Amino acid sequence: MKRHLLSAGDLSRDDAELVLRTAAELRELADRPIKKLPALRGRTVVNLFFEDSTRTRISFEAAAKRLSADVINFAAKGSSLSKGESLKDTALTLEAMGADAVVVRHGASGAPHRLAHSGWVRSSVVNAGDGTHEHPTQALLDAFTMWRHLGQGKEQSLDGRRIAIVGDVLHSRVARSNALLLKTLGAEVTLVAPPTLLPVGIDTWPVETSYDLDAVLPKADAVMMLRVQRERMSGGFFPTAREYSRRYGLDGRRMATLQDHTIVMHPGPMVRGMEITADVADSDRSVIVEQVTNGVAVRMAVLYLLLGGSEPAVSTSSTNEAEE
């Protein structure tokens, strides 16, 4: 893998499949009494979050700790950032602390790229979400979840699998990263949204688009629902929440039209009753909770591979060492 993970588009198929295979090894730790490995002992991982986050920050923290890394959580609120300190000065502070990896979430698209290529830090940089641009580790954990449920053949290939991503594509960094990564892995992606929630330039994405959810659902192998990000909206993108749910929400009636093997996904946080009803979110088809579990394994794999992992991630000797 490259030194940084900034975009899902930076990953070759070999890179992506290496992450998925490594995550599969590390996923087994979730079922063990002792969940730690010594792989990153002595390394320091900094979680630098300029935006609020629950799942992603906790997931990266758990991932680093399970690899025995030292973890520093650095939130904008309550730090010098809230007093006007620049990204550069914050980066220089992290460099002085000896950070080996910086996991950054920022409201400005391109901030992780700036941090990685500015020369301010020598550490690996992982994009944990930048504005409406990208969220590559979310795409990796989504692909890993699909890989476990829908993978075909010895290599568990996603070639030809049809994935529907439904909702607020315009403001979704998850949709963009998934579109790029799933194309790399051979899947066919259809974005379903009202015209007002599709970005300018969508015709350049490696996807198909549709305004008709009912026409897309029966053909899909996986359906990913997206939250309407009202905090990023300044105008009216649809008439009412009720009208949006009627046309683009996944409810029990629509779930009944899915193929028997089709899974239902959501990157979170969910708004139950808006884009997805409670009965669908809690159904046997839903893998939403599993996505969270898989997220830790995938982020462990990313940190392990970026920080120099070349041997198998899990071995008997390393497990025994962690238990001592």
UniProtKB/Swiss-Prot annotation:
Keyword ATP-binding: no
Entry binding sites for L-aspartate: K83, R173, R227
Described purpose of this protein according to its UniProt entry: Catalyzes the condensation of carbamoyl phosphate and aspartate to form carbamoyl aspartate and inorganic phosphate, the committed step in the de novo pyrimidine nucleotide biosynthesis pathway.
Summary of subunit composition and partner proteins: Heterododecamer (2C3:3R2) of six catalytic PyrB chains organized as two trimers (C3), and six regulatory PyrI chains organized as three dimers (R2).
GO function terms (MF aspect): amino acid binding; aspartate carbamoyltransferase activity
This protein's pathway: Pyrimidine metabolism; UMP biosynthesis via de novo pathway; (S)-dihydroorotate from bicarbonate: step 2/3
Chemical reaction(s) catalysed: carbamoyl phosphate + L-aspartate = N-carbamoyl-L-aspartate + phosphate + H(+)
Stated family: Belongs to the aspartate/ornithine carbamoyltransferase superfamily. ATCase family.
One term under GO cellular component: cytosol
E.C. numbers: 2.1.3.2
Gene that encodes it: pyrB
Name listed for the protein in its UniProt record: Aspartate carbamoyltransferase catalytic subunit
GO biological process: 'de novo' pyrimidine nucleobase biosynthetic process; 'de novo' UMP biosynthetic process; amino acid metabolic process
